[in-house]
Amino acid sequence: MKPLYQELPFADDNYINFYREDLPHFIVPWHYHPEIEIMCIEKGWGTRFVGDHIGGYEEGDVCMMGPQLPHEWRNDKEFFDSDSGLRATCHCVYFRKELFEGILIRLPEMANIRELIERSRRGIKFTGESRERIARYIRRTFLSLIHI
């Protein structure tokens, strides 16, 4: 199946965009976009499709997808039952690729960031302390933004 191109809404001068989705089930089909994405699953479970990988996902999962990497999170069947009461909730952070271009990213101090971006081109599932810290930071940042 050919992935759909998704255009993400960014204000002209923003390089980072925070987004929260809370629905009976995830609705975005197999798609790709030029932005780097970090997705934190708050509620829900099902099947994750990232590039050529297929695997399960569950609450608490944190993944990073690089630019142009096709992906989809598909909830299990019970989420599509109208009286299930289940919710699919996630927090996403999108980074414009231009943020990681130019002289700054070439600095020696940015070597770990360059490696992370390169690895994200095939998708990264964070585990352990990294997963916990990233999820906590995304939730805290999102909450601070809605209270501005």
Each predicted region: which residue ranges?
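A short, N-terminal "cap"/entry segment at the start of jelly-roll beta-barrel domains
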Residues: M1-D12, S130-R136, R140
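Flexible, active-site-adjacent loop/turn segments at secondary-structure boundaries
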Residues: K2-L8, N14, F26-W30, E98, ...
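N-terminal regulatory/effector-sensing and dimerization cores
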Residues: Y15-E115
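Regular secondary-structure segments
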Residues: E42, R114, A135-L143
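Charge-rich, low-complexity amphipathic helices
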Residues: C63, S82, R122, A135-R139
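A broad detector of the eukaryotic-type serine/threonine protein kinase catalytic domain
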Residues: E98-F100, E118, R122, R139-L143
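Aromatic/histidine-rich interaction motifs
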Residues: L107-R136
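Conserved small/polar residues in nucleotide/adenosyl-binding loops
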Residues: I146-I148
